[in-house]
């Protein structure tokens, strides 16, 4: 299963998300089967424009949005929501 994630290189939420994804992968072996393609929206704006999102990081499975970060979330909330996103992806396998 392959996810597409839109990011910005200096975005603090994107940096945090990468750390959280690595934490989740270390905790859950089954996440090794989920591939993530990270796309810098500033480097590929034409591709980013094809997807419906407002904030980064945002994750998609095909064109279905599975996750869009919020600046209001704590680190724990973001990790919980990323975990729920991975659960949803694994159910589709």
Spell out what each predicted region is.
Residues 61-93:
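Non-catalytic, surface beta->alpha helical segment in thiol-disulfide oxidoreductase systems
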Residues 1-27:
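Local sequence-structure signature of Cys/Sec-based thiol-disulfide redox active-site neighborhoods
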Residues 48:
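A hydrophobic alpha-helix adjacent to the NAD(P)-binding/active-site core of NAD(P)-dependent oxidoreductases
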Residues 26-30, 91:
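Secondary-structure boundary motif
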Residues 51-61:
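Structural micro-motif
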Residues 31-45:
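Thiol-based oxidoreductase modules, predominantly thioredoxin-like and allied folds used
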Residues 12-13, 43, 73:
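Short alpha-helical
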């Amino acid at each position: 299963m392959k996810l597409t994630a839109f990011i910005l290189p200096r975005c603090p939420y994107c940096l945090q998300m990468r750390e959280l994804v690595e934490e989740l992968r270390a905790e859950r072996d089954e996440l090794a089967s989920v591939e993530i393609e990270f796309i810098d929206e500033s480097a590929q704006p034409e591709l980013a424009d094809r997807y419906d999102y407002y904030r980064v990081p945002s994750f998609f499975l095909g064109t279905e949005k599975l996750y869009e970060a919020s600046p209001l979330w704590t680190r724990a909330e973001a990790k919980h929501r990323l975990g729920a996103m991975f659960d949803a992806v694994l159910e589709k396998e």
